[in-house]
Amino acid sequence: MASFRRFRLLSPLKPCVTFGRMLYTRIDKDGLTMLAGHLAYVSLLSLVPLITVIFALFAAFPMFAEISIKLKAFIFANFMPATGDIIQNYLEQFVANSNRMTVVGTCGLIVTALLLIYSVDSVLNIIWRSKIQRSLVFSFAVYWMVLTLGPILVGASMVISSYLLSLHWLAHARVDSMIDEILRVFPLLISWVSFWLLYSVVPTVRVPARDALIGALVAALLFELGKKGFAMYITLFPSYQLIYGVLAVIPILFLWVYWSWCIVLLGAEITVTLGEYRAERHHAKSVTTQSPEM
């Protein structure tokens, strides 16, 4: 009787255990931590070129001049750990120095920025185990569209948001408190939508929208929790500042970028495993229904 009761308690957990086992096997086989380390290295190499290209695009449109300042502050306040101010100062110095580069150097910056997008594309298709290859021209067109249209669309959305916030009817107390609540979850929503687009568009195979939404939601929640946990760790355990002094920002930035990519790739693994788990259950049911006829 006791064993039967325990079986009834464990039976709802069995799908979760099976899914967790499949997810762990996939993560181990794909070498998630090594892939995250590769992307972290490429990200640090491409960080300054990518930011330079993005804010050069904003500079080309006068309407985005004020928005670019707000966007920069928003990114470092919501997507970087506690040392975001220091990192922002260093990156602004690097970007200012890059303005004196020649045409050849500028082309090199663009190529290096595209390298990050190419690396993300390659790693995600490794996780999806896709053998389909895009043509070089098509791939370059997609990378260039992401590099150029992405920042412009973000800037346009912030222009619209600023316009809506300036309207007089939004000054009402109840509406104002509602806007505060929306702005509080805005970074989470941006992360969710960004991860969903990443998992849906980048792989060269068809990805079910529901799986991509679930994987993106888990990644977005982990990203928000990881950001707060990392900031707490840096504040409460300042070992890097004690050891490295002024240079502490370098290992802290690398750790944060590496941790971020671990979360992004974990969301991708969850998205893939959801499809595999569903296929496994469908196969098990078909075998069960056919066995009596045998």
From Swiss-Prot:
Membrane topology according to the record: Multi-pass membrane protein
InterPro entries, alphabetized: UPF0761_bac (IPR023679), Virul_fac_BrkB (IPR017039)
Keyword terms, alphabetized: Cell inner membrane, Cell membrane, Membrane, Transmembrane, Transmembrane helix
Transmembrane spans: 44-64, 67-87, 108-128, 136-156, 185-205, 212-232, 246-266
Cellular component GO terms held in the UniProt record: plasma membrane
Compartment list: Cell inner membrane
Family: Belongs to the UPF0761 family.
Protein name: UPF0761 membrane protein YPO0028/y3801/YP_0029
